[in-house]
Amino acid sequence: MKIEEPLEDLDVNNLQQSSQQVPFEHIIETMLDENIPLPTLYLYRLSDISDKDLENLQQYWLKIPLWRRRALMEDLQMFAKRDLLLSYEGIGRLALKDPDPKVRIGAIETLMANECECLDLIDIYLERMEKDEDLSVRIAAASALGQFVYLAEMEALKPEIKTNLEDRLLNVAQNGNDSELRRRALESLGYSSRDEVPNLIELAFNTPDPNFQTSSLIAMGRSGNERWNAQVVSMLNHSNPSIRSEAARAAGELGIVEARNLLFDLAEDANQNVCMSALWALSQIGGKGVRKLLQERLQEAEDEDEISLLESALDNLDFNEGTHDMALMGDEEEESDELFEDSLDEDLEEDIYDFDEDEDDFLDDLDDEDFDDFLDDEDEDYDFLDDEDEEDLWG
C-alpha cells in the first residue's frame, strides 16, 4: 500500500479520534482507486468496524485491487501487534473468505495478532487446516489453533470441544501430507497434556531434520513440563542458529535456572535472533546480573525493535521478580503459621501432660479412706445439679 507516515511519528490518540470523523464511504472509494494512497488515518477507522460499515465493505471487497487487499491485511496485522486497543476482527473474518490465499493467510495472522479467542473460530480454522486448497493457508490455520489448545488446557473450553480439537490436530501431526503442516500442528499441541503428545515431541527432537528439532523445542517450551529441561539445555550450543534461538526461548518458558550461564553467553551471539531470544529468556528466569545486562543493552541499542524488546524484557523481569517475591512471602507466612501451630500443639500437650501428672500425684497421696471421701464429694456435686431447679440454674 503502504502507509504514508512512520508509526513512531503518529499521535495515536488523535488518530483514533479523528478517524471516526471520516465517512466510511470515502474510505471505500479510496480503496477502490489504486492511484490514491490509503492514509494511516483510514486504517484506524477500520478498527471496531460497525456491522453496517462491514456489510457495506463486503459489497465492494472483491472490487478492491488484489495487491491492495494483500497489503491492507499486512498493515492491519502490524497495527494490531503495535496497539492492543485496535481490533480488526470484523475485517479479518471478511478476509478469511477471500479467494486469494495470501489474503486468507493475512486474515488469520491479523486475527492472531488481535488475540481473537472467539470459539467459533476453532471450527473455521480446523476446516482451513484440513481442507483449504492452499497449503500455506492450512499451515497458518494449524498455527492459529495453538491459542485454543492453550485455552482448552486452562479448562476454558468444554471437554467435547477440547477433545475434537486435539484429535484433529493429532491426526494432522501424525498423518499430514506435508512436513511443515505436521510441524505446525505439533507446535500447537505443545500446550496439550494429551498422552500422545510427549512421544510426538520426542520423535521430532530425535529426527535429523533441523526443522523438526526446532518445532520440538517450541512444543517443549509450551508444555511447561520440566521433563524436557535436559534436552532444551543440550541444544543451547547447537551450530544451527534457529535451533539455538528456540532452545533459548524454551529455556525461558520452562524457567530453567541451570541454563542461565549459557543464556548469558548467547546474549552475545552473533545471530541477532539468538541474542534477543536469550535476553528475553533471562527476563523470564531472572537472577543476579540480568537486570544490569538488560539495562546496559538498552542504553546501547539503536534499532527500534531491539529497544522495544529490551523495554518489554525489563517489564517482564519486574513482573516475574515481583511474582517470585510474593511467592516467597506466601511461603514465609505459611511456614510461620505452621511453626505457630506446632508450638501451640506442643504447649497444649505439655499442659495436658502436666495436669495428668499433677492429678496422679494427688491421687497417689490419698489413702483409701480419703479416696472414698473424694469420690463421695464428687457424687454430692452431681446431686446438687440434679436437685437444682433448671429454671433457677440457667436464669
Give the predicted meaning of each segment.
Residues 30-71, 75-91:
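Alpha-helical solenoid scaffolds in large eukaryotic transport, assembly, and signaling factors
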Residues 74, 109, 143-147, 187, ...:
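Residue-level signature of alpha-solenoid helical repeat scaffolds
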Residues 77, 112, 146-150, 190, ...:
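Structural signature of alpha-helical solenoid repeat scaffolds
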Residues 210, 214-222, 226-249, 253, ...:
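Alpha-helical adaptor scaffolds
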